Amino acid sequence: MEEKKTESTNKNVKKANLLDHHSIKHILDESVSDIVTSRGYKEDVRLSNLKLILGTIIIVVALVAQFYNKKFPENRDFLIGCIALYVVLNAVLQLILYTKEKNAILFTYPPEGSFTSTGLVVSSKLPRFSDQYTLTIDSADPKSISAGKSVQLTKSVTQWFTKDGVLVEGLFWKDVEALIKNYAEEEPKKKK
């Protein structure tokens, strides 16, 4: 009985390679997503779906160009059109990544039943050769009347991981929830 408890506890442990900052960032980002969604915010996957659709169209264009019935000299104009379309669609995809996504790890809808808040854009940064993890919460609709001010948390990742690379979820959870609460307090209050 005791062994089963230990096994189930070990399965839920999030462990990172402390020498790999990508591994650390991935575990922290995954935990942030879990925390935010547990607070009643549902994930908005529209941007991800748009990127997938664009990527699929790009692949279809490349496949059509590759396996078109006619051989090269005869299909020259068609190939030029496919190449141009491929470049344009990739440029659109990169533009979306650069302007909309940036460092975002999670887009959310407003909490259900809430008429006074917008969804969230949660973004994070862990620069190379640095231990400073920056977590930012912004409004998904910054032009909205009910958009809150951006809040930010910057801390050393060494405060959340043991020397074995295990994430101390309680400490991290507390810091992220405090940031979410801080954002909720920053939201503009309705005038009566």
From Swiss-Prot:
Gene Ontology CC annotation, any one: signal peptidase complex
Plastid recorded as keyword: no
Keywords: Endoplasmic reticulum, Membrane, Transmembrane, Transmembrane helix
Keyword Transit peptide carried by entry: no
Superkingdom of the organism of origin: Eukaryota
Primary subcellular site in the record, as a coarse category: endoplasmic reticulum
Coiled-coil spans in chain: none
Lumenal topology ranges: 70-78
Membrane spanning residue stretches: 47-69, 79-98
InterPro entries per the UniProt record, alphabetical: Spc2/SPCS2
GO biological process, one term: signal peptide processing
Cytoplasmic topological domain: 1-46, 99-192
Family affiliation: Belongs to the SPCS2 family.
Record text on subunit structure and interactions: Component of the signal peptidase complex (SPC) composed of a catalytic subunit SEC11 and three accessory subunits SPCS1, SPCS2 and SPCS3. The complex induces a local thinning of the ER membrane which is used to measure the length of the signal peptide (SP) h-region of protein substrates. This ensures the selectivity of the complex towards h-regions shorter than 18-20 amino acids.
Cited function: Component of the signal peptidase complex (SPC) which catalyzes the cleavage of N-terminal signal sequences from nascent proteins as they are translocated into the lumen of the endoplasmic reticulum. Enhances the enzymatic activity of SPC and facilitates the interactions between different components of the translocation site.
Protein name, UniProt field: Signal peptidase complex subunit 2
Protein species of origin: Arabidopsis thaliana
The organism's taxonomic lineage, starting at the top: Eukaryota, Viridiplantae, Streptophyta, Embryophyta, Tracheophyta
